[in-house]
Amino acid sequence: MKKLLIIGITVIMFFFNNQATADYEKVFFDFKIDSIGGEKIDFQDYKNKVVLLVNTASYCGFTKQYDDLQKLWDQYKKDGLIVLGIPSNSFNQEKNNNNEVKEFCEVNFSINFPMSVITDVKGDDAHEIFKWAKKNYGKSAVPKWNFYKILINKEGKIEDTFSSLTNPTSNKIVSKIEKLLQI
């Protein structure tokens, strides 16, 4: 019985291990992505910053979270927070092209935080940043739906992930951001 208990605890610890302390071969800052405006976003530019990476979509029930993502950006960008939106059609709820997404975000939500081009976030065609996240943090870093959030610390490692149900301005997210920003 004791042996079974030890095996059970070991299995549980394996599945709930905090991968944020994993020995990363690469960190977040080693990647790049195309911006929705046509430039290249080099994550090296975000070194020593805290990044909230969010896969977004225009036709989702969570699309209203754009407002709160913009509020986070406005409130904490001076302290070193980067909100990075990654529009995705991985869940079949995004517009047809980047110009439509850009216009939608600017007109409806006055978005001015960095946004990438429409990007796959899961499966074999996922952008390398999402493959990196899965490799280093496990399945909990794979977006389950639109507006899934991955919090990256100043060292370029995954600190935490948050479901689509977790509002960007929730105490759960804001307290982690403030802790990482040391404010």
Regions picked out by a protein language model, each given a short descriptive name:
Residues 29-30, 117, 131, 153:
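Terminal helix/beta-alpha structural elements that buttress the NAD(P)+-binding lobe
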Residues 131, 135-183:
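Thiol-/selenol-based redox modules, centered on thioredoxin-like
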Residues 49, 55-59, 87-90, 155:
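Short pre-active-site segment immediately N-terminal to redox-active cysteine/selenocysteine motifs
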Residues 20-44:
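N-terminal "domain-start" segment that seeds a small globular fold
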Residues 1-4:
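Positively charged n-region of N-terminal signal peptides that target proteins for export
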